[in-house]
């Protein structure tokens, strides 16, 4: 599937687990388009943030069941990607600068 670069990466994931991975091993977490491949994620992150990506690991997160009163619904499944950057590269969006 042909996705535009800005459509591949949806948003950064700012969680405690993602912060530990970023501090320990230069891994940054993103929510990405469900149909995006690892190669597309790598190209998108390199182009959007002007960094060199060494590795991309992806996982499909299951949507949670949600209730509103008696009605039961389900949030959709989504994909997250852990991106490892080259030594010395950082993404300012995560650094807070």
UniProtKB/Swiss-Prot annotation:
Taxonomy, top ranks, is: Bacteria, Pseudomonadati, Myxococcota, Myxococcia, Myxococcales
* Protein name listed in UniProt: Large ribosomal subunit protein uL23
The reply on keyword Transferase is no
Question: Which Gene Ontology CC terms are recorded?
Answer: ribonucleoprotein complex; ribosome
An annotated GO BP: translation
- Record text on subunit structure and interactions: Part of the 50S ribosomal subunit. Contacts protein L29, and trigger factor when it is bound to the ribosome.
Record-level Gene Ontology MF annotations: rRNA binding; structural constituent of ribosome
Domain of life of the source: Bacteria
Enumerate the InterPro entries for this protein: Nucleotide-bd_a/b_plait_sf, Ribosomal_uL23-like, Ribosomal_uL23/eL15/eS24_sf, Ribosomal_uL23_CS
Supply the NCBIfam families for this chain: PRK05738.1-3, PRK05738.2-4, PRK05738.3-2
* Keyword Cell membrane belongs to the record: no
